[in-house]
């Protein structure tokens, strides 16, 4: 599933193409994705001007001049295309007044499209329970330590809980925990202010670096332009089981990156440097 950096990258690509443009033609190929698409969806979008975009966690809002926003969720395999020939499983096509063509392609149909009043975006059922944005100033060591206090789950599982912090997924949690030197299996309630003081900057730096690289291309994800993301080339632990840890002096000190499974998801870490 695309995580925060991939969604941010997609949103920026769409904003560059769509902001200020009118939607001259809207084609919806099916009435539902993961959930039913609202009746009148095409009519509400047709002729509307795109005023801007906003990301919340792994969700995007395309804001229209009708006090309405289109919620877009890429799900597991969804992607947006710009000026591409129609693709299989392209469920939504937007054509602008200057001739740009935007497509929403989702082979597995775990994505979502919905309409919400712009003023009520944060009240949408998919948004209301989300935790803070990790790149906002309000996400601090103090707020994270408070959210984790008393939790008996491993820190990795806690960070994947979207009510604790929004937008993180398996890749970036693994990478941030490595940067912070924190073992993924450590109980979340033992993090405290001290370790949170390392973890919060590590999360922010990991996400910032990933956005700058256009995200991580893994299976289905590409940028709207069709380009791959490049952050997968900078992974320190994710999908690197058995490979050397860059922080360790060599095989005599470290067996390399370890892999375990937590809650059905692969976890990667260095047992020597993460505690």
Curated annotation (Swiss-Prot):
Catalytic reaction annotation: Hydrolysis of DNA containing ring-opened 7-methylguanine residues, releasing 2,6-diamino-4-hydroxy-5-(N-methyl)formamidopyrimidine; 2'-deoxyribonucleotide-(2'-deoxyribose 5'-phosphate)-2'-deoxyribonucleotide-DNA = a 3'-end 2'-deoxyribonucleotide-(2,3-dehydro-2,3-deoxyribose 5'-phosphate)-DNA + a 5'-end 5'-phospho-2'-deoxyribonucleoside-DNA + H(+)
Keyword annotations from UniProtKB, A to Z: DNA damage, DNA repair, DNA-binding, Glycosidase, Hydrolase, Lyase, Metal-binding, Multifunctional enzyme, Zinc, Zinc-finger
Manner of cofactor binding, per the entry note: Binds 1 zinc ion per subunit.
Catalytic residues in the record: 2 (schiff-base intermediate with dna), 3 (proton donor), 58 (proton donor), 265 (proton donor)
Required co-factors: Zn(2+)
Keyword flag S-adenosyl-L-methionine: no
Zinc finger (FPG-type): 236-275
EC number(s) stated in the UniProt entry for this protein: 3.2.2.23, 4.2.99.18
InterPro entries for the chain: DNA_glyclase/AP_lyase_DNA-bd, Formamido-pyr_DNA_Glyclase, FPG_cat, MutM-like_N-ter, Ribosomal_uS13-like_H2TH, Znf_DNA_glyclase/AP_lyase
GO BP terms, alphabetized: base-excision repair
GO MF term list: 8-oxo-7,8-dihydroguanine DNA N-glycosylase activity; class I DNA-(apurinic or apyrimidinic site) endonuclease activity; damaged DNA binding; zinc ion binding
Pfam families: Fapy_DNA_glyco, H2TH
HAMAP family the UniProt entry points to: Fapy_DNA_glycosyl
Function description: Involved in base excision repair of DNA damaged by oxidation or by mutagenic agents. Acts as a DNA glycosylase that recognizes and removes damaged bases. Has a preference for oxidized purines, such as 7,8-dihydro-8-oxoguanine (8-oxoG). Has AP (apurinic/apyrimidinic) lyase activity and introduces nicks in the DNA strand. Cleaves the DNA backbone by beta-delta elimination to generate a single-strand break at the site of the removed base with both 3'- and 5'-phosphates.
Summary of subunit composition and partner proteins: Monomer.
Family of this protein: Belongs to the FPG family.
Designated name of the protein: Formamidopyrimidine-DNA glycosylase
Gene: mutM
